[in-house]
């Protein structure tokens, strides 16, 4: 454990080493130095800890610990300032971070870490402008160049390897994994690299348990790492655990009260739990958080709209739709069209809902990651299947449900929260029952309950599937 305090040109570093098995203090030290001595203190602290542990560091380990990548205190200071702003997850602060990194590069053009900082910051920035194709192509080209430069200047810098992995993960590129693993080999305490491997398992492979393992490892290393905390909640919710997700998200909001995606996932958790009024009230209190980018404003009105539809407040939806129409690219994104068609379903106009979702699925829709388009198609298939069930057209419902993607991949938190994939077999069960095929209905309910085996017992679909399965088994 330790802390760093700076006053003017003086810095105080305190450190202590504790045996976690018995809480026994093994070592403690205080270092008061001029800021110009900061790199020497870094070496001194590392060596002191190694001596207490009676570890003999290899030459490579000494080099890695001692490496500052720059002899310039000013460049180092600018990098640290930029890094602080880059993890605030707001577009204005990310631009500030990029400015600090560029200033550091002007002072020391061979300093690898600011290049990595720019690449990581611009990758994050690409999510905030997700609907501007020209901007995305330009910024991701810049990301790749800066990530390559960082690795060329600092091949043994964990942050450089991580940044390339972060960029490739953004592209859903399988090679991301090797860069992220290399980052962890170079720095086993790199929390964000652990988080990004969790992202890799969740986004590209749909392995929820493996993803959770890595998110939790990341949070042990850094409990305040915003993306790891968020993605742990998101994955928990994808497992159907709304109650657990709500506990986690309240802790996350205490740590990150000004990060909009925590508010977005709380709204999703309340909606899954059937607390539609609470979801609406909560989003109304968060409006000021969603004003810094177009993507955030779309998220805000989209959340309000979903809540209003589930509360049957159809007369208030027109106002939400009008607000969405004032946001650039509204006609090329999913929010306006999804809400329009969802409203048709809940108003009982099932044929129009089918036609609307079909047209929506066959149109151009801007999404911020390539593998999200199939997620959106599945959601359209889901609502078309629900509509066909209401119309008693069971074979058409089955046909829609058979078109789902084969596994639960894709991070859909900036799209529509994807709880639909496991529910496809629940709807199949309803359709087969409607057709009188009780054996297929039973198999479908069993598959649904297996897919969502960790889900809350009080979710409506879980309770209904169990009851229907019980009756089918009794009848057979």
Where are these regions (language model features)?
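Amphipathic alpha-helical segments of tetratricopeptide repeats
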Residues: 106, 185, 220, 254, ...
């Amino acid at each position: 454990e330790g802390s760093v305090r700076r006053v003017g040109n003086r810095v105080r570093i305190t450190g202590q080493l504790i045996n976690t098995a018995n809480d026994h203090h093994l070592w403690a030290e205080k270092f008061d130095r001029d800021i110009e001595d900061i790199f020497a203190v870094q070496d001194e602290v590392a060596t002191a800890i190694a001596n207490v542990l009676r570890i003999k560091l290899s030459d490579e380990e000494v080099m890695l610990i001692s490496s500052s990548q720059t002899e310039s205190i000013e460049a180092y200071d600018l990098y640290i300032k930029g890094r602080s702003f880059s993890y605030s997850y707001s577009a204005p602060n990310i631009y500030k971070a990029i400015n600090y990194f560029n200033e550091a590069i002007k002072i020391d053009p061979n300093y690898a870490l600011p290049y990595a900082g720019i690449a990581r910051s611009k990758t994050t920035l690409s999510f905030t402008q997700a609907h501007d194709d020209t901007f995305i192509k330009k910024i991701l080209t810049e990301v790749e160049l800066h990530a390559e430069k960082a690795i060329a200047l600092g091949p043994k810098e964990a942050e450089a390897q991580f940044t390339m992995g972060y960029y490739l993960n953004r592209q859903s590129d399988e090679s991301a994994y090797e860069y992220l693993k290399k980052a962890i080999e170079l720095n086993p305490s790199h929390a964000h690299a652990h988080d990004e491997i969790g992202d890799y398992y969740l986004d590209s492979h749909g392995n929820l348990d493996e993803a959770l393992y890595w998110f939790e490892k990341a949070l042990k290393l850094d409990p305040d790492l915003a993306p790891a905390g968020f993605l742990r909640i998101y994955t928990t919710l994808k497992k159907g655990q709304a109650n657990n997700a709500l506990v986690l998200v309240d802790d996350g909001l205490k740590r990150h009260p000004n990060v909009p995606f925590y508010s977005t996932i709380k709204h999703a958790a309340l909606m899954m739990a059937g607390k539609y009024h609470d979801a609406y009230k909560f989003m109304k209190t968060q409006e000021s958080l969603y004003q810094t980018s177009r993507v955030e404003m779309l998220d805000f009105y989209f959340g309000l709209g979903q809540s209003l539809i589930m509360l049957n407040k159809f007369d208030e939806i027109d106002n939400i739709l009008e607000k969405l129409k004032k946001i650039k690219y509204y006609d090329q994104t999913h929010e306006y069209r999804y809400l329009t068609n969802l409203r048709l379903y809940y108003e009982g106009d099932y044929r129009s809902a089918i036609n609307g979702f079909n047209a929506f699925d066959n149109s151009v829709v801007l999404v911020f990651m390539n593998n999200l388009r199939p997620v959106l198609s599945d959601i359209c298939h889901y609502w078309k299947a629900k509509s066909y069930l209401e119309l008693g057209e069971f074979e058409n419902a089955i046909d829609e449900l058979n078109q789902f993607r084969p596994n639960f991949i894709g991070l859909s938190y900036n799209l529509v929260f994807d709880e639909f994939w496991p529910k496809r077999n629940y709807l199949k069960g309803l359709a087969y029952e409607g057709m009188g095929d009780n054996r297929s209905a039973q198999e479908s309910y069993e598959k649904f309950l297996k897919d969502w085996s960790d889900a809350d017992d009080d979710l409506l679909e879980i309770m209904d599937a169990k009851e229907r399965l019980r009756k089918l088994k009794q009848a057979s």
